Amino acid sequence: QIEELGITPYKVVTEPKFHWEKVTELYNEVKMTKPYDWWIVSDDDEIQIYPKPIYEMIDECETLGFEFITGGFLDRIGENGIFPFVDETTNIWDVFPYSGFFRYPLSGACPNKVCVMLGRVKISNGQHYAVFDDKNVWGEEGAHHRLRYPPGRGEGFIQVHHFKWDS
């Protein structure tokens, strides 16, 4: 069916579920095939909401010399704190009506996300940080990294709605 759209998969891989290191390795491998193109990286339990049209954000990055755009997780949860069953007919906004910041305080899950980047920008496991010279760019250094958009902490931050239907 995908071939009918003129799309040929780069690679077909079968791995055990929740093998985050392998997922990140594949993201990086595929991105490096087009190092000067812009890539949106999103896991299948995430929906990214941009504060303005993505082409405007990328144009700003190209004009100002930024190479990656970051965001942060908004954890989604169902009524009474449940993780509801999801299938292809589910309206996820209806069954996950609540959002907040609870996974980090409860489990230490990293809330950062590198959402959009040039293909040559390597990302860490979980796509939480950009990696330069084999070092994760994080914390205050990451917030003010010269290649990061938005600079500092503020306008341009992408909302990453995290629907934990695989919990």
Question: What are the functions of these language-model segments?
Answer:
Residues 37, 45, 67:
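Conserved acidic residues
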Residues 21-24, 50-167:
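Catalytic-site signature of metal-activated, phosphate-bearing donor transferases
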Residues 2-41, 49-50:
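Active-site-proximal specificity loops/subdomain of glycosyltransferases
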Residues 1, 45-47, 160:
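Structural hydrophobic-scaffold residues in regular secondary structure
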